[in-house]
Amino acid sequence: MTNSTGSTAPATVYKLVVIAGHAPEPSFTLTGSPVTIGRELYNTVPLNDPHISHEHARITQSHGCFLIEDLNSVNGTQVNGVSISGPYPLQPGDIISLGNFSFRLDEEIIAL
């Protein structure tokens, strides 16, 4: 987006940054919606952990807000140490825990 001075406005990128567990990537950029987290390779965030369900959780974006929902997983999903049920709003800095993994939702401003 270009502002009145002709310069380009910065873009905001959101990432799930791995803070516990051994994921195939150190972070996952939240592009598109929905983002699925689970044990199967077809998930946006595939995690090799027997404590994570095949389709464990889903993150969607609506009107600039991210929501995470546990998909009836066996071991549940936590945000900031609290078990969630139903869609739960996420904010930058929130810690998402499932199985042996924890992620932090980071917001990154990129100058264009």
Question: Which residues are covered by each model-predicted region?
Answer:
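A short, compositionally biased micro-patch
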Residues: 21, 30, 40, 50-52, ...
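Residue-level detector of beta-strand structural context in well-folded domains
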Residues: 26, 33-35, 43, 57, ...
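Residue-level signature for short turns and capping positions that connect secondary-structure elements
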Residues: 35, 42, 52, 64, ...
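C-terminal boundary/linker segments immediately following FHA domains
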Residues: 46, 67, 78-112
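Short hydrophobic/aromatic patches on the structural cores and recognition surfaces of FHA
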Residues: 16, 37, 55-60, 64-79, ...
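Intrinsically disordered, low-complexity acidic Ser/Thr-rich regulatory segments
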Residues: 1-48, 60, 110-112
